[in-house]
Every structure is written in C-alpha cells, then in structure tokens.
Amino acid sequence: MAHKKAGGSSRNGRDSQGQRRGVKRFGGQLVLAGNILIRQLGTKVHPGENVGMGRDYTLFAKVDGTVRYEKFTRKRKVLTRVHIDAV
C-alpha cells in the first residue's frame, strides 16, 4: 500500500488587522463639527483653527465648515497644519 507522510506546517500564517489610519477628509471638503479629519500616530499633521486633537492624536472638526491644509515651517522643518474655515 502506498503511504504519504504528513506535510510540514508553516509557522507563518497570521497577520494583525489594519488600524485604519490616514486622512478621512481632504482639502475643500465640507465637514460637520465632530467629524474626524485624520487618524494618525503622533503629530504628522498639526491642528490649526477650529480643529481639536484627541488623546490618540486624532484630529477632528470643532465647527461646521471647509477643510484647508497648509504647510508651515518650524525650526527649518516643513510641517502640515489643518484648519476648518467656518461656514
């Protein structure tokens, strides 16, 4: 009788869920107060006018309005800031 031994099992085969970070509202979009603008790790983007920051660095709109991104310089480093222009 022919026999086939069991194949080896791989030790990989697992992966963690993505954390759904990134920009949720882009420049020029209308947002409502409380809408999440960006989910991020650390301050890749800084909060500007009418934008709040949560404990986990999430940026959110404080008022209804239009999203506007702006680049600015601090200590010879170009950073990004997000504002909400109230409607």
Swiss-Prot record:
The keyword Ribonucleoprotein applies. InterPro entries: Ribosomal_bL27. One of its GO terms (biological process) is translation. The keyword Repressor does not apply. One of its GO terms (molecular function) is structural constituent of ribosome. GO terms for cellular component: cytosolic large ribosomal subunit. Residues 1-22 are annotated as: Disordered. Disulfide bonds: none annotated. Keywords: Ribonucleoprotein, Ribosomal protein. Belongs to the bacterial ribosomal protein bL27 family. HAMAP family: Ribosomal_bL27. NCBIfam families: L27. This is Large ribosomal subunit protein bL27. It comes from Nitratidesulfovibrio vulgaris (strain ATCC 29579 / DSM 644 / CCUG 34227 / NCIMB 8303 / VKM B-1760 / Hildenborough). The lineage of its organism: Bacteria, Pseudomonadati, Thermodesulfobacteriota, Desulfovibrionia, Desulfovibrionales. The gene is rpmA.
